[in-house]
């Protein structure tokens, strides 16, 4: 069976009509907006349907749309090797309750992607087996990829600017 976007969308709408919030297509790629509480059902259907067979979770990531509600989005990219077809699932996540169900039961490879998204954005994946920080130190406060994180940082010294940088640094004198 040759898969195309209308076929995939029609199968999803027929099987889980109340789970979908909308869809869009950009440069031939299908994106489907899913209710957060139904992401596991939609992902399981896409994986287990004998005609669709989206057996591979390529990646998932977080996006911060500061000033919009829902503020965050978790984006999942799935691939059907059998049909050579991709689909993108998008789940809006509220700033007040930044949580979405984990997909680690369906794809164990989601483990590190979810931990990274938690670490960088503070989105909690409920049901995750070990949602600890993965990139930042345990005592780090906040989530560095949120757009409201202060950017006050020390300028890095390179060969082109080291004289200017080092002129203001107190160095130990021997």
Curated annotation (Swiss-Prot):
Keyword Nucleotide-binding included in the entry's annotation = no
Q: Which UniProt keywords apply?
A: Cell membrane, Membrane, NAD, Quinone, Translocase, Transport, Ubiquinone
Catalytic activity, reaction form: a quinone + NADH + 5 H(+)(in) = a quinol + NAD(+) + 4 H(+)(out)
Q: Which InterPro entries match?
A: NADH_DH_suC, NADH_quin_OxRdtase_su_C/D-like, NADH_UbQ_OxRdtase_30kDa_su
Q: How does it sit in the membrane?
A: Peripheral membrane protein
- Where is this protein primarily located? membrane
An example GO CC term for this entry is: plasma membrane
| Enzyme Commission code | 7.1.1.-
SUPFAM superfamilies under this entry?
Nqo5-like (SSF143243)
Q: Which domain of life is it from?
A: Bacteria
Disulfide bond annotation, renumbered to this chain: none
Q: Where in the cell is it found?
A: Cell membrane
Please tell me whether the keyword Transit peptide is annotated for this protein: no
One GO MF term: NADH dehydrogenase (ubiquinone) activity
Outline what the protein does.
NDH-1 shuttles electrons from NADH, via FMN and iron-sulfur (Fe-S) centers, to quinones in the respiratory chain. The immediate electron acceptor for the enzyme in this species is believed to be ubiquinone. Couples the redox reaction to proton translocation (for every two electrons transferred, four hydrogen ions are translocated across the cytoplasmic membrane), and thus conserves the redox energy in a proton gradient.
User: How the protein assembles, per its UniProt entry?
Assistant: NDH-1 is composed of 14 different subunits. Subunits NuoB, C, D, E, F, and G constitute the peripheral sector of the complex.
Protein family (similarity comment): Belongs to the complex I 30 kDa subunit family.
Name of the featured protein:
NADH-quinone oxidoreductase subunit C
Give the organism, scientific name.
Roseiflexus castenholzii (strain DSM 13941 / HLO8)
Read off the lineage from the record. Answer: Bacteria, Bacillati, Chloroflexota, Chloroflexia, Chloroflexales
